[in-house]
Amino acid sequence: HFNAPSHIRRKIMSSPLSKELRQKYNVRSMPIRKDDEVQVVRGHYKGQQIGKVVQVYRKKYVIYIERVQREKANGTTVHVGIHPSKVVITRLKLDKDRKKILERKAKSRQVGKEKGKYKEETIEKMQE
């Protein structure tokens, strides 16, 4: 992944969706994007209030979040880079393309459930 091109880095930089969004869309994770709202769940800044993604820095594999910043020695504040796997998305910025992706992912999950090892009828027969 050190010399992965940008379009593959996008995929690597995915974040899990919050429990509510997971229920709503039937999708587990999504590549992160600039105006998503996220909550940090690991590391020094975890548990802080929800913040908006200010920048997605693919070269460094980090995202910068609105309120996650620190003060430099000279007094200026800078954003702290956080890896996307350490946040959960609490609100998605939806446009038509992103909706399409969600529908596509949800559809493939449905297919996966139908492809399960046992159907309900066979389970009922086994219990008899």
Curated annotation (Swiss-Prot):
InterPro entries: KOW, Rib_uL2_dom2, Ribosomal_uL24_CS, Ribosomal_uL24_euk/arc, Ribosomal_uL24_KOW, Translation_prot_SH3-like_sf. One of its GO terms (cellular component) is cytosolic large ribosomal subunit. It is found in: Cytoplasm. Keywords: Cytoplasm, Ribonucleoprotein, Ribosomal protein. One of its GO terms (molecular function) is RNA binding. SMART domains: KOW. Pfam families: KOW, Ribosomal_L26. One of its GO terms (biological process) is cytoplasmic translation. Residues 105-128 are annotated as: Disordered. Belongs to the universal ribosomal protein uL24 family. Component of the large ribosomal subunit. This is Large ribosomal subunit protein uL24. It comes from Gallus gallus (Chicken). The gene is RPL26.
